[in-house]
Every structure is written in structure tokens, then in C-alpha cells.
Amino acid sequence: MAPKTATRIAVTHCLLALPAALGCGGGPDLQHLAQEAVLGTGAQAEMARAALRAAGPAGLEALCEAHRGLLERAETHRDPERLADDAEWRSLGAALDAVGRARDNHAARLYWHTDLEAAKAAARAGGKPILSLRLLGNLDDEFSCANSRFFRTVLYANADVSRLLRDEFVLHWQSVRPVPRVTIDFGDGRVLERTITGNSIHYVLDAEGRPLDGLPGLYSPAEFVAQLRALRALATQSAGPPGALRIVRLGEVDPVRAYHAEALNRLRRRWAGQLMTSGAPVELALSGLARGFPRAEIAAERAFSKMRAELPILGATRLDDWPLEHATEQIGWERLAARLLPDVQLDAGSLRLMRTKVAAASGCRTDAMAGGGLDAIVESFRRSIALDTVRNELLFHREIHKWFLHGVGGDDLDLLNARVYAELFLTPDDDPWLGLLPADVYAALPGGGVRTGPRP
């Protein structure tokens, strides 16, 4: 029998058997589907996973509950390689990824929408804001961009982060473009495959899909939670009736702009304090701390007649953060990040996921988990997270605060995202090569080594 014919017969059989998976009221029997999604074969399991996906977060919850015993055993399993060889565990992992639309979802157990309109409907129904991730590649692919892979390890697998995301936000992701991949063939059977370039950003949106803020790149779990809790409160404060425009009455202060004004205040005070405790020149740090904060621009809006005259002046005369930037350059970002290192902690869930990812192939970090090898990898990763947290907050997030403060954050998420990728991440939409193909570089290869066509 031809493979295609066999597949059609299997699918037909599953369709005929589908009524058995329905409850008395005609709705899906999630418990039955949860079993079929893992223990079923071929098209049967695929259809069960699709039905659980269509059921929304309840489908994912049913899948986790039905296989709670296996999930709990995996949490205490000390041999990642033996666990990976378990057929039922592999099937459960694939089911969790398919239903939640995220790779490594056994560690996070989160449900992600891939349709923003569906996410907005869920947010309105649940009275929650939306956390919308923009990334290169797809979140449910192993080879999504590096930052999104780090999110899956550092953030989504973290118990505190995943609980906050599950309880307080509706989750959504959208790919900006495919992620570049590079393969290095050493010619002796060894191949190294990685992604290169690309960045990711989490946006917090109100239930109507309007941006409230963006958290660019990787943050430590503690900092990520703190930022999201503050934005959850802002979403509640700024919420209006479903479908209502976000309008600020004359004499009132826009809560979103006020939030970003105060966030800039806190950021600059914190920056100056970190510099002073890191050995930066005190006069430069204090000079940065003494600079005028943006609250005056908010205050000017309280009187409309004054606003038209004063806002252009305030915008032109507002001093920048040069002293803070200069002091940071003098001591180095690594020294500043070292102050944050004690707060960068990976919990048990993140460490378990890291353990499964550490390469143990012959000739490549063999026995990396023995003799303290994994500890060294974890410590190096923690330092990298601390550096990313400091740079992303003080460089990128600072600019995003300014955009919102000056009213250019806008209600259009796509326009905001295009600006983030063009001006902050330096990967604009109009550069199909993401800066990897300079026009003035000679490669001594036919066509510059460029090939076009679908990815194999």
C-alpha cells in the first residue's frame, strides 16, 4: 500500500472515531483527547493535539493534568539522555509543544496565541493585558533566534515567571521574519549549526492590542517579573470600556505617558546609583542624577494654552544622558553588570532545561555535566544574562520610554515594532540580509557566496 493511501485511510479512521472523543453535550472530551495526543499513533495523535489546541488554555491544562505523573517524574529525573530516549516522554513533549505552540513547553506549560485578534478576544473576555512576543523565526521551532531560545530557558521555564504569565496575561507571539542560520561543516563528520543575528522583544498590550510598553531582549527573571507586575498595574489603570479609544481629557495626564515619565526617573536614578557603587567618577554620576527629569513635559500638558508654547521648548532644552553614558563607558558595561549578578538566579526549572540542552556529543563538551562542567556553563550564562539585562534596560528600554513619553509609541504595534527593529536592533525591514551582506566587501566567491531559494 502506498504511504499516501495509508495516511488517508488513517485520517479517515480518526474522523470516524472522533465522535467518541466528544462529550455528551457535543463539546470535546478533553481528558480523552489528552490521552490520544500522547498515546495515540500517527494521524490520531495529530488530530487530538489539534483539538486540544483549538480548546485553548483549557486544552493545555487537560493535557498537563492527564500526564501529571510523567511530568512530575521528569522533574526529578537525573539522567537527561535516558529521559530523552523514553518514547512516551518524547510524545508528551511534542504534544505540549503543539498545543501550546512553543518549543520546550514541558518546562513552561504555557498557551500562546499566534493570532492577535484571538488574543485580543481572550484578553477582553478575561480582563487581562496581552504579552506579545515578536521574534525572528517561530517560538515552536528549536532554531528560533537566540534570544527567544534564552527566553524559553531563563524566563518561561522559571516557576515565578510562568505562573505570572499564565495567571495575569494572555500570551501571543508573531514572527518578524525567518531567522538566519549558519552551518559549519568541519569535514570530518562534525557539524556546528547555530542561528546568527536577530533580536526579540516582549510588548505589553492592553486588551484592545494597543502598546503600553516593550521589554527589549533578555532580562533576568527577577527584573522581568518586576517590569511585568508594574505593567499589569498600568493596564488596569489605563483600561477603558471594550473598544473604547484611549482618550485623555483636557487637564488630565495620560497614565501611559506618566508611567513612562516616572520609569525614566527611576531608571536614571538607578543607573547613577549603580555607577557610584561600581567605582565610576562620582561627579559624572551625580551630574547625570541631577539632570532634569521629564515630569515637566507632562506637567505642561495640564494647561493647554501653556502646552503649545512650552512643550517645544522643554523638548529642545531637555538635557540628555551623556554623563551617565560617559561614566558607563569609562568603567565598562561588564563592571556595571557585575553589580546585578547576585540577582540573576536560575531556578530549578531553568537548570533542568539547561541540563537537557548541554551538548554531550563525542568531541564536543563530552561529560560536560561531570566535574563541575555544567556549573561553569551556568555561571558564564548568568554573567551574560546580567550584561544583557543592564544593556537592554539602560540603552534600549530607555529609548522606548522616551518614545512613549513623547507620544510616538503610538497605538500601532506594527509601526512601533518596525521602529524598534530599525533603530534599536539595527535590522530594518528594508534590509533582507540583516546587515550580513555589506555592499563593499569582496568575498572571492561566485556571486559573493549568495544563493537564493527555499531553505532545504
Identify the meaning behind each predicted range.
Residues 10-21:
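Bacterial N-terminal signal peptides
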Residues 113-124, 150-213, 226-231, 378-391, ...:
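Thioredoxin-like thiol-disulfide oxidoreductase module
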Residues 37, 115-129, 135:
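A short beta-strand-turn-helix
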